[in-house]
Amino acid sequence: MKKKLSLLISLSLVAMLLLTGCGSGNSNKKDENVFRVGLEAGYPPFNWTQMDDSNGGVKIDGSAEYAGGYDVEIAKKIADGLGKELVIVKTEWDGLVPALTSGKIDAIIAGMSPTAERKETIDFSNNYYKSQLVMVVKNGGQYTNAKTLADFNGAKVTGQLNTFHYSVIEQIQGVKKLEAMDNFPAMRVALESGVIDAYVSEKPEAVSAQTANSNFKMIELEDGFVTNPEDTETAVGIKKGSELTAKINEILSGISQEEQTEIMSNAIKNQPAAQ
């Protein structure tokens, strides 16, 4: 009786292992057919959240919402070039690099700059957009006619947490550098309510801000911030040593600067008004 029971248990274990193996095989095969991209979906015009698939929006994984914007359009082109299905994984800014290194996502396409500090942890593709740093202020306010960094002496200024936007604020003489904020929607609210006088941004986001809300104004500085060239570039974040890097670079090389400009112009035009 004991022998029969042992045999039954052994057979059951073998069956379970076989089923588990089959399940894992199918799961891996499925994963091979998708390209999982992490982004905030809260940094227009690079990326935002919307309620439907209008203007090329892509459904956010595990959500009823969709993501749209410049990054999403670039992600679609890369996914097509790889022959994979695009899956958007909405991720907080601080969680993007950990999500990539842990394998939760395959790439970061989130308006991220390939800074030297980030390159210590992850690899980057060639850039897919180049920009410049600007300031966003309240239209008609104290700093609406500012032209140089010196004009922001005494101003309450902030930038996004864990970005070089925040670190360059120290280049403004006499500035009141406030605590960094989690995201751009929060900075826009703070600016409109008077909590801050200005925030540091890249030009596409600033154009997006003043397009969405006439209470905001972009200031292009005559005597601007000193930055490294890579700081104002935008590139795809990829896991260290990944074979995806070369493939993504090849796909990006087929997107001309004129096409980049057109995609960005459409993103600014199509962004949800609330963002």
What are these regions (language model features)?
Residues 23, 72-81, 163, 229-273:
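Extended ligand-binding regions for polar small-molecule ligands
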Residues 29-112:
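Extracytoplasmic small-molecule ligand-binding "clamshell" domains
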Residues 44, 64-80, 112, 134-188, ...:
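Bilobed "Venus flytrap"/periplasmic-binding protein-like clamshell domains
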